[in-house]
Regions:
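Cyclic nucleotide-binding regulatory module and flanking cytosolic helices
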Residues: 1-33, 78, 83-84
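Alpha-helix/helix-capping structural signal
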Residues: 18, 53, 108-109, 130, ...
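Polybasic "coupling" helices that flank or enter modular domains
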Residues: 97-99, 114-181
Length: 252
């Protein structure tokens, strides 16, 4: 397994070499194709994923077929959190919104590794905490902030998860992510392009001015980013000298 993939995924990069080597034989490269379905709601979870690049979205679909994003996952995280919490059923559908790659693993094998490795288990619990905080922040954001602010936040979050500032994105999909009509997305993206913050062409977005996007985004972007750093920063996981346990250090 290429070391680049391990270093690129934030959670895998926090593991010691010894812990990672135990996982490595069970990990395999997976291509995240655009709109690929990773999980269907209320169906068993067979595999879990550590994204390397690309972005997956958790989507809730209502009885009339409408869908809205409730969470996003990229190279900072992990697709398959219910497995970490003792469940094997997906509570929502998960789709690839920005194509890329990931490292996949059988869900049963991963659950076994969690039970035998306290460091991996605690890393995943911290990630679950950070992710649920992000979901809560997004819910507040959807009620309190303007569409343009939310769109800028979403573009920034996606940019942070990609190797470059250029990625695939359609108005239709962004509309589902933000829970607004496609015409609204067209107006907002057009305004951002006119202001020189982005370039949008044939389903591709290029971020031209990251700083200006941050200024237009709501505070939710920075709040979520800092919370991930607090819970999953480079100093969050420190091996102890005793052979029996490797624990996550306290975070002030």
């Amino acid at each position: 397994m290429p070391n680049r993939d391990r270093r690129t995924n934030r959670l895998l990069s926090l593991l010691s070499d010894e812990d990672y080597e135990r996982l490595r034989p069970s990990l395999s490269p997976v291509v995240f194709d655009y709109k690929k379905s990773l999980y269907e709601a209320l169906r068993p979870i067979e595999r879990v994923y550590f994204p390397v690049d690309g972005v997956a979205s958790l989507v809730i679909t209502t009885a009339d077929g409408s869908g809205a994003e409730v969470g996003t996952i990229g190279s900072e995280g992990f697709v398959g959190l219910p497995v970490c919490l003792g469940d094997r059923v997906a509570p929502s559908s998960v789709y690839v919104q920005v194509p890329g790659t990931a490292l996949g693993m059988d869900a049963r094998v991963f659950r076994t590794e969690l039970e035998r490795n306290p460091t991996l288990n605690l890393i995943m619990l911290r990630y679950a905490h950070a992710f649920f905080n992000q979901v809560a922040q997004s819910a507040a954001c959807a009620h309190l902030h303007r569409v343009e602010q939310r769109c800028c936040r979403w573009l920034l979050m996606t940019r942070d998860r990609m190797p470059t500032g250029d990625f695939l994105l359609t108005h239709e999909f962004l509309g589902m992510m933000l829970g607004v009509r496609r015409t609204t997305v067209t107006d907002v993206m057009g305004a951002l392009q006119k202001a020189g913050l982005i370039r949008y062409r044939r389903g591709h977005v290029t971020i031209l001015d990251h700083q200006a996007l941050e200024q237009r985004a709501c505070e939710c972007y920075e709040i979520s980013r800092l919370e991930f750093d607090r819970l999953l920063g480079d100093t969050a996981v420190t091996p102890r000298t005793d052979k029996k346990h490797r624990l996550i250090s306290e975070v002030g």
